[in-house]
Amino acid sequence: MKLEGVIVATVMPFAKDGVNYEGLRLLLSKIVEAGYHGVFPTSSTGEVTKLSAEERVRVMQLAKEVAGGKALVVAGTGTGDHVSTIDIARKYKDVGVDAILITPPYYIQYDWAALYAFYKKVLDKVDIPVILYTIPLATGYNVPVEVFEMVAGEYSQVVGVKDSSGDFRYHLDLIHLLGKRLSVLQGLDMLFVPSLVMGAHGGILAGPNFLGRITLEQYLLVKEGKIAEAVALHNKLMPLWRFMGGCGLVGKLGGKWPTLYKLATQLVHGIDMGPPREPLPPVDDKDRRELEKILKELGLI
């Protein structure tokens, strides 16, 4: 499997009593109809760590149904140990997902040997396509490129690596050392176009939840060699990404990252996102007004 293009890390609409599955169905349908290459509902953006195992499975069953073979379906583990990672991966395999993204261990910062041992234990038991992942915002560390290199060299089911570090030097190392063997996928909207220009194969991104086809157009422009046009689109979106909090992950709005994406999706599509799962805070009135202003300037609402 060669992963290329734009896979959308979808936001998760909630009702008071659980996941709003009809709202999720509508959002997934819009993304698939827009022509995106894949959907990824059990993502960090989708608040995967706050979903029960049963909710994760049902969400992925719905995604598989809506995608209907038109888009890849990727599932995230959202777990921090090898036992629960293997368990949820097997459940996802039964659903029929196309690939799983493995969240690295979190809470404790691990050394190279411990990380390698984690991947080995998981990959010895999981035989469907796997995307490796680094997200220091959640784990407190960046998985060393050399660990990914060792794991990918040993396990043929590893097909890609998603980088949500925001560290572009690290990202270039991934492209240089792994890009001929694996799909290197950018995880931050702000860095998508620069990554493509430097040889990344695509991205797993949250912006397409509310940007229509803009992110897809960026990808296609770079593929067609129309770099200046892609950069122009990138620059047009910079006020949005700066407001969202520096790559949508860190900065002045830090912990509001998922909820800002959810609010933007609600404003653009009219899908009720419901409350965030605690302890995520709701967006306050000041930030809501600023977000509405930016979306209006972009012609999205």
From Swiss-Prot:
Query: What Pfam families does the record point to?
Result: DHDPS
The record's top EC class is: lyase
Any single GO molecular-function term of the entry would be: 4-hydroxy-tetrahydrodipicolinate synthase activity
Report the locations given in the UniProt record.
Answer: Cytoplasm
Name the keywords, alphabetized. Answer: Cytoplasm, Lyase, Schiff base
Task: Give GO cellular component annotations, separated by semicolons.
Answer: cytoplasm
Q: Which gene encodes it?
A: dapAL
Please state which protein family the record places this protein in. Belongs to the DapA family.
Query: How is this protein named in the record?
Result: Uncharacterized DapA-like lyase PAE2915
The record lists its disulfide bonds as: none
**Which domain of life, per UniProt?**
Archaea
Q: Which residues form the active site?
A: S44 (charge relay system), Y107 (charge relay system), Y133 (proton donor), K162 (schiff-base intermediate with substrate)
What the entry lists under InterPro entries is as follows: Aldolase_TIM, DapA-like
Q: What is its EC number?
A: 4.-.-.-
Subunit note: Homotetramer.
SUPFAM superfamilies in UniProt: Aldolase
